[in-house]
């Protein structure tokens, strides 16, 4: 990656595909040797990712990126997600980019956002 803007753009486009439910668009963003890791998944490949993770896109209404830090071909993003049932959650993800494609995503689960947690965050000045 030559510019930071390109890394940010790929990360934002990745989340936008979940909002639009556009599997073709996300497939175009991922490298052939893409891997995905989370507390539930250990370096699964693209085929397993689409079987196990992509169906979750049907439950996602939106993402709100709170922080996005990048350096070279890597980025960390913290976001709040909202499901169609109104539930909210917050996660952090690490992205590694190679050749204008997303090569690796590592998800670090955080908390489900409840009304009580949102009130605590507001009092602490966190939006």
Predicted regions and their residues:
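Generic alpha-helical secondary structure
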Residues: 7, 46-47
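Short, low-complexity N-terminal intrinsically disordered segments enriched in polar/charged residues
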Residues: 1-24, 28, 32, 116-127
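Acidic-and-aromatic substrate-binding clefts and catalytic sites of carbohydrate-active enzymes
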Residues: 42-44
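A beta-strand edge to alpha-helix "cap/lid" segment located at domain peripheries
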Residues: 37-39, 50-127
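Intrinsically disordered, low-complexity segments enriched in small/polar residues
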Residues: 12-16, 32-34, 47, 77, ...
């Amino acid at each position: 990656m030559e510019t930071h803007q390109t890394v940010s753009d790929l990360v934002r486009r990745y989340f936008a595909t979940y909002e639009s439910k556009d599997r073709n668009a996300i497939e175009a963003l991922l490298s052939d040797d893409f891997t995905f890791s989370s507390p539930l998944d250990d370096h699964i490949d693209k085929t397993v990712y689409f079987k196990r993770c992509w169906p979750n896109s049907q439950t996602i209404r939106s993402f709100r990126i709170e922080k996005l830090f990048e350096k070279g071909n890597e980025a960390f993003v913290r976001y709040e997600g909202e499901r169609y049932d109104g539930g909210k959650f917050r996660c952090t993800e690490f992205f590694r980019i190679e050749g204008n494609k997303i090569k690796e995503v590592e998800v670090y689960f955080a908390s489900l956002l409840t009304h009580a947690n949102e009130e605590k965050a507001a009092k602490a000045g966190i939006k």
